UniProtKB/Swiss-Prot annotation:
Enzyme class, spelled out: transferase
Native source organism of the sequence: Staphylococcus aureus (strain MSSA476)
InterPro entries, sorted: NDK-like_dom, NDK-like_dom_sf, Nucleoside_diP_kinase, Nucleoside_diP_kinase_AS
Active site: H115
A biological process term (GO) from this entry: GTP biosynthetic process
Family: Belongs to the NDK family.
EC numbers for this chain: 2.7.4.6
Protein's name in the database: Nucleoside diphosphate kinase
Principal location listed in the UniProt entry: cytoplasm
Cofactor: Mg(2+)
Keywords: ATP-binding, Cytoplasm, Kinase, Magnesium, Metal-binding, Nucleotide metabolism, Nucleotide-binding, Phosphoprotein, Transferase
Function: Major role in the synthesis of nucleoside triphosphates other than ATP. The ATP gamma phosphate is transferred to the NDP beta phosphate via a ping-pong mechanism, using a phosphorylated active-site intermediate.
Length: 149
């Protein structure tokens, strides 16, 4: 089973959308196997978004992601990276499809509700960055047979 990293950003946490976002992810067949509400330390934010260092939006991005709590999570399922990217929608909410998380709930590019790993390599790196091994669990669910057999 594939795993990916998702992070509900401060704008969604402040708007009380954690439950709505998780519900959409679970209804699509992905299983939450790790999750935590946390204030992002500056060092973690800088490491996570290191690829954007030097870009014009970098400082604002770091400031935003550390401004209020996020809900970091690991989800598991068949083709989890691609399925989650489809549910999330385009980075710019005004270009995201209706029915996607960003299309329905996002406000601007800078306030777009959720981050999701864009590849298996990114997912592995981000999961290892945000979670310790003991914070992620595996469990059988009766619905697995309905989804994957």
């Amino acid at each position: 089973m594939e795993r990916t990293f998702l992070m509900i950003k401060p704008d969604a946490v402040q708007r009380n959308l954690i439950g709505e976002v998780i519900s959409r992810i679970e209804r699509k067949g992905l299983k939450l196997v790790g999750g935590k509400l946390m204030q992002v330390p500056m060092e973690l934010a800088e490491t996570h978004y290191g690829e954007h260092q030097g870009k014009p939006f970098y400082n604002d991005l770091i400031s935003f992601i550390t401004s209020a709590p996020v809900f970091a999570m690991v989800v598991e399922g068949e083709d989890a990276v691609n399925v989650s990217r489809h549910i999330i929608g385009s980075t710019n909410p005004s270009e995201a499809s209706p029915g996607s998380i960003r299309g329905d709930l996002g406000l601007t590019v800078g306030r777009n509700i959720i981050h999701g790993s864009d590849s298996l390599d990114s997912a592995e790196r981000e999961i290892n960055l945000w979670f310790n091994e003991n914070e992620i669990t595996s469990y059988a669910s009766p619905r697995d047979a309905w989804l994957y057999e």
